[in-house]
Structure formats: structure tokens, C-alpha cells
């Protein structure tokens, strides 16, 4: 179904894609016949919900800031260079399943966050709308899972049981929604960081840095890790 106002050029920018042009566009993508002129027009419709939690982000620095609306708040800067503005009106949430039962971060507010902590958030009007703490770096807590199963988009805190000779495949142990210990083999080919408790620093890392006994945060989709953080 084509929205009635798709031809409103004040609301939508219409671009022409040449047949010889290679380009990557966000889904979904709706194509429309440009008519007798023969050119193919494309309207890009980005329907990603702002209500969906982000991939977990590692905090690099917290500071007071003023946004473009002259609102005083908190600028949360993340490892990797991204940042987000947090005002006074934030809905604090907790992960599901046994996560909140095995570690309690319910009293942690944005002003309590610090270097190394890991959060997820949603935005509205370029500000944090909802926020949940995934890991406090000084209180990592026991192994646990967020979600009914890790096959869905979710997080787990797991222990590394063994690492294959190829340095990329690891067997990890976590606790499922029923409290039972589970073992899973995972190919670690995602963005990876290592938090070093000896100096409090966060380093770019890789699967080859995994060691037996490491405790790790794994954010994955259908067992395919998107982010791994090694705590050592």
C-alpha cells in the first residue's frame, strides 16, 4: 500500500537510482514507476522503531552537556565514538527472564553510570527515552540470560569453558530461563572488546583473545554474536 502523501516532496526526498549504481539502502524499500519518462524513482522509507533497544553500548565517559534546545542534561559517550543525550525524563527498565533475578541494577540512574558500564537504550526526539543497565563493571554478577532463549535477539553473561585451536570458536556456559546450566558452541566473529580490571581500561579485542575462565557478555541474534565484551 502506497501512503497517500508519498508524493509530498516537502515530507519525502525522491532520488533517482541509475541502473549502474551500486548502493545499499535500509529496508524496507518501496519502488515506484516513474511513468513514461522511463527513469526508476525510489522512495526510501525508514520504519525502524525508536522503541527498540540498541545493541549494548560500553560507556567511555559521562559529562554534563547542553543540547540544541538549551536543555541541561547528561552526555553519555560510548567506546567507539558514539554519544547520546539524556535529559531528566528517562524510563528505567530491567532486562527480562532471570537477568533481573540474578543481579539487581534497579536503583542505578544515569548519574550513577561510569566508565566501563554497559547499557541499552531507546531514543525519542534525539534523547534517551528508556534505559536499562546490562552490566555494572564493578558488579558483573553471575551467568544469566536476557530473553526466553538466546536464539532471539538478546544478551547473556557466560563463562568461557574452552576455546578451539582456531581461536574463533568457544564453548560457553550460561543459565537458561529455568535456571539450568547450558553449554553452547559459538563462532565469535563480531565486534569484540576486553575490559581489563587491572587498569580499568577497555581495549579493542578479538576472538583470539578469549581464554578459558573468562566471563563474557555476548549480544547475539540466532546464535550469531553482534557484540562480545570480555571481562578479565
Which residues make up each language-model segment?
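...the same signal can extend to comparable exposed beta-sheet modules
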Residues: 1-232
